[in-house]
């Protein structure tokens, strides 16, 4: 039997963005490359990679009426393609995981290309674009006021470099990506009716302060009120808040942190706005300028995509995101002061009451839990609301005893997407899958909800699996909040 010497997981090889309509003149092929990571690669290599991608896209276009080439698998790499806007292509290149074994005294590499799920990593590629659009707008709109096409391209390249240099450093390790990353899903915090209504009342801020067009509330990393944002925009807001606000102290990045944010995180006593940071020329230190314009984001409200100012307010464990029309004058300090005086007492009281309620629930649940709940063989479940992209699961995503990659890939293949075609497919179905490593996956779909139960039992029969899955469905599907949308 061959001895396993080493296993190399999935890694990011390169990520680049190009547009074939640029650089049409011979000798200007480099203009097609708008962004390339890693940046220290020779220009000729970048041009060759983009040229190869162009050839692949054109070749596959001869076999389908769609202009969307999706993936190319080779022995050592997997390339994922995504065209978010006409002419603009994002390409993600991954190194295939491999196992190095010793056979008859010779090291042999066994590449495991089947472990890479196209659906998971194409979803991550789409999210890379959606986060850019959320913070900067569409590719085609960047520099639209500039009449010179070369200068317009340069402005776009600068924005891409500024955004993706930071975004890729915060990107989740490809080896750890799973079905949750594919779904772009978020978790809502279920509350009792009284607390939920108190949180919902902050939606009336639009009446008290007409400048506010929408508000989103989170408690730690879970959403309390999602407002009228689309699931995709809500996921972008959630990702931005989690990465750039909630985890800012643990991060070594240069994200702006106001004194009020540091105070609200560390002491959890006084609320405050998270303000932007302005770099002062010739000064090594960055300063928070209280007159800085708030961050501008691009979301869809009332079926219209347009820019909004995003104000982020922190009080204890609550984060409140306020959206103001960016077509108007940027908010002045007086508005910040009025909002702070109005919201601080109410949000602080609400945050403390939620914390108290969660503490009581945790104490009650502690007596019912057992240590086997997180074991590798314990039943796992995942429930998905396709329309709101809510999910509920007991997956331990960051622990070593998580689900094997082949199981996650099967779930990704079984999962229905949120697109119109997928949502109009079979309204109800049930599928059971047995894997080679003794896992059973049971999927049920009904009324735009997907339910998965994952069992690990080598001796289980089909009847045993059916009965256990039914028991878990009946036991866990008791939260009406999850199914109300």
Curated annotation (Swiss-Prot):
GO biological process terms, semicolon-separated: autophagy; endosome to lysosome transport via multivesicular body sorting pathway; vesicle-mediated transport
GO molecular function, one term: guanyl-nucleotide exchange factor activity
Family: Belongs to the CCZ1 family.
Name of the protein: Vacuolar fusion protein CCZ1 homolog
Gene disruption: observed consequences: Accumulation of autophagosomes and reduced number of autolysosomes in fat cells caused by disruption of Rab7 recruitment to autophagosomes leading to a defect in autophagosome-autolysosome fusion. Impaired lysosomal degradation of endocytosed Notch and Boss receptors in the developing eye leading to their accumulation in the brain.
Subcellular location, principal: cytoplasm
Location(s) in or outside the cell: Cytoplasm, Cytosol
Subunit note: Component of the Mon1-Ccz1 guanyl-nucleotide exchange factor complex made up of Mon1, Ccz1 and Bulli; the interaction of Bulli with the Mon1-Ccz1 heterodimer is mediated via the C-terminal Mic1 domain of Bulli. Mon1 and Ccz1 form a stable complex which displays Rab7 GEF activity with or without Bulli; GEF activity is enhanced by Bulli possibly by improving membrane association of the complex. Interacts with Rab5 and Rab7; preferentially binds GTP-bound Rab5 and GDP-bound Rab7.
Coiled coil (residue ranges): none
GO cellular component, one term: Mon1-Ccz1 complex
Organism placement in taxonomy: Eukaryota, Metazoa, Ecdysozoa, Arthropoda, Hexapoda
Keywords for this protein: Cytoplasm, Guanine-nucleotide releasing factor, Transport
InterPro entries for the chain: Ccz1, CCZ1/INTU/HSP4_longin_1, CCZ1/INTU/HSP4_longin_3, CCZ1/INTU_longin_2
Protein source organism: Drosophila melanogaster
Regulation of catalytic or functional activity: The Rab7 guanyl-nucleotide exchange factor (GEF) activity of the Mon1-Ccz1 complex is autoinhibited by the N-terminal disordered region of Mon1. GEF activity is stimulated by Rab5-mediated recruitment to membranes.
């Amino acid at each position: 039997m061959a001895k396993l010497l080493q296993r190399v997981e999935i890694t990011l090889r390169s990520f680049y963005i190009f547009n074939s309509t640029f650089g049409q003149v011979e000798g200007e092929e480099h203009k097609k490359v708008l962004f390339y990571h890693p940046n220290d690669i020779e220009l000729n290599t970048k041009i060759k990679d983009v040229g190869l991608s162009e050839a692949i896209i054109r070749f596959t276009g001869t076999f389908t009426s769609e202009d969307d080439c999706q993936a190319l698998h080779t022995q050592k790499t997997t390339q994922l393609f995504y065209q978010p806007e006409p002419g603009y292509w994002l390409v993600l290149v991954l190194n295939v995981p491999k196992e190095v074994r010793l056979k008859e005294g010779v090291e042999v590499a066994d590449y495991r290309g089947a472990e890479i799920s196209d659906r998971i990593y194409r979803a991550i590629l789409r999210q890379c674009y959606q986060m850019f659009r959320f913070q900067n707008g569409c590719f085609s709109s960047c520099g639209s006021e500039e009449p010179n096409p070369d200068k317009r391209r340069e402005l776009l390249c600068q924005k891409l470099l500024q955004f993706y240099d930071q975004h890729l450093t915060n990107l989740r390790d490809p080896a750890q990506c799973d079905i949750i990353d594919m779904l772009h899903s978020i978790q809502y915090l279920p509350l009792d009716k009284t607390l939920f209504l108190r949180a919902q009342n902050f939606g009336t801020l639009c009446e008290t302060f007409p400048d506010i067009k929408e508000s989103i509330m989170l408690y730690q990393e879970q959403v309390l009120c999602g407002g009228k944002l689309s699931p995709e925009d809500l996921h972008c807001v959630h990702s931005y808040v989690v990465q750039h606000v909630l985890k800012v102290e643990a991060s070594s990045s240069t994200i702006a942190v106001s004194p009020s944010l540091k105070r609200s995180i560390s002491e959890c006593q006084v609320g405050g706005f998270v303000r932007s940071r302005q770099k002062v020329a010739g000064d090594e230190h960055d300063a928070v300028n209280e007159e800085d314009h708030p961050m501008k984001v691009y979301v869809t409200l009332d079926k219209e995509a347009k820019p909004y100012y995003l104000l982020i307010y922190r009080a204890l464990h609550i984060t409140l995101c306020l959206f103001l029309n960016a077509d108007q004058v940027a908010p002045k300090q007086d508005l910040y002061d009025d909002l702070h005086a109005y919201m601080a007492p109410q949000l602080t009281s609400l945050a403390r009451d939620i914390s108290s309620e969660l503490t009581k629930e945790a104490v009650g649940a502690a007596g019912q839990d057992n240590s086997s709940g997180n074991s590798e063989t314990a039943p796992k479940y995942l429930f998905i609301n396709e329309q709101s992209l809510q999910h509920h699961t007991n997956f331990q995503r960051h622990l070593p005893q998580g689900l094997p990659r082949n199981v996650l890939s099967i779930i990704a293949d079984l999962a229905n997407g949120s697109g119109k075609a997928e949502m109009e497919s079979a309204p109800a179905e049930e599928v059971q899958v047995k894997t080679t490593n003794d896992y059973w996956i049971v999927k049920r779909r009904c009324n735009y909800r997907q339910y998965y139960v994952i069992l690990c039992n080598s001796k289980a029969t089909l009847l045993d699996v059916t009965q256990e899955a039914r028991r878990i469905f009946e036991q866990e599907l008791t939260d009406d909040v999850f199914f109300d949308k």
